[in-house]
Amino acid sequence: PFYLSQAEEDFPLVNEDYSLNGQNMIIAYNSPVKDITVIGKPFNWGFFFLGRDRGLSFYWAMKLVVMVLLGFEVLMILTKRKKALSLIGAFALTFSPAVQWWFMQHVGDLIFFTLGLMTAFYHYFYNHDKKWLRTLMMLLVVIFGIGFILVIYPAHQVMLAYLLIFYFVGLLIYYSEKVSWDLLDVVLIGGAVLFIGGVMVHFWLTSKDALLASLNTLYPGKRVSTGGKWTIGEFFSFLTNWKIPFEDINYSNNSEVALFYHFFPTVFLASPFVLFGKKDSEQKLLGRILMIFCLFSIFWITVGLPKWLAEITLLSYVPPLRAILSFSFAACLLSIWFIAYIWREDVIPIWYKFILLAVNAWSYFYAITHSKMDNYFSDFETIAVAVLGTVILAFALFGWRRLFYLVFAALVIVSGFFVNPVVEGTGAIFEKTPAKEIQKIDQ
């Protein structure tokens, strides 16, 4: 409704049709606004030159297509250019329940911008000798950086910002002696910082009252989290993802349990074989960065920090339940990195692979039977989830690639393709009798 209302009112900064004093539309779920801040919202650009209906189509299509492309590029980096695995993984990210159930809200936007920044950071260093590509990557940093900041949902934003910091610092350390810094770096980095800073100053001057009002609310502004609150079922709620498009969860809501698929327990237990040693140092660097972030997230979720330290680190804005979603995103990237690595380097002994499979089956079964998921799944479904989930892992561990692609692709389709219906046009809204009457009054 925000987006369509903006199109009807010529995209004002403050839409007077909402609330007593109007609604600041930059803060309102990244709605399209004729303002410089729209630079950071590329999926909204279509509203300005395609009209209301086609602009909305542009929003959905661009967000989906570009997220697939960004996910593909990030995974090509992580997997050392394994195209088939990267393509399946890109669809697994874009059509993950975590993204699809929150597609027009914070998660969809933040994952989009995070993937964009990860791509731009990497290629800025990796292709440093190509000045035109360096310039293009910094332009993407400006666009995605502005977009990331303006989502303004710290419960997810803070953790994903930490992931980006870990990722950037890791790349900076690795490439610091491999690139020759020059004047162009000073111009690009300095220019990007100044431009982003200028946009943020403009945003503050035009939206200060609305932003302060939001931050002074009980939720999310005054909420203070210290971490350390979790249940086993929350970590494994992605096990429900295949079912919730067809039957609503009975102990929460579908968006709260929607996560990214991953095999983090397996990767953690296999880490002595895949994360240590000097061979493939760049690839191991990326895996180590993701593992460190996952462990950082787990520490916050399970142990927590004193209030004063949580506030200094901004983690006070991050409830553990929200942190689990960010953790699952990084764990998904790590899992795909892991699969690519063991397909290239057969470093895990066969006997240990069977131990990993047994632990996986037991952890799935235990997580379901010792959580609220036990009342959502039937006994047959519980066993089926444990068995089929372990079978998918077996396909990955033993390198049965075609079977893995087939079954995992089917899982992605079932879990994500049926969440948001395909609709043609906006007639379902504007052709209704109440809508027509409202438009007459507005005229």
Can you say where each PLM-predicted feature lies in the sequence?
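Juxtamembrane membrane-water interface segments that cap and precede transmembrane helices
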Residues: S19-L20, F43-F47, W230-S255, W308-L314, ...
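Periplasmic/ER-lumenal interhelical loops and adjacent helix-loop junctions
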Residues: V201-L286
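Extracytoplasmic
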Residues: R401-L406, L411-Q443
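Transmembrane alpha-helical segments
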Residues: M67-L75, T114-F125, I165-G170, Y174, ...
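Membrane-embedded helix bundles of polyisoprenyl
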Residues: V65-I77, K83-Y175, D185-S207, V359-A367, ...
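Membrane-interfacial entry segments at the cytosolic side of transmembrane helices
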Residues: K131-L136, S176-A192, S281-L286, D346-I355, ...
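Active-site lumenal/periplasmic loops and adjacent helix-entry segments of GT-C-fold
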Residues: P1-F112
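Membrane-helix boundary/interfacial segments in multi-pass membrane proteins
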Residues: R54, F58, A98-D109, E282-L286, ...
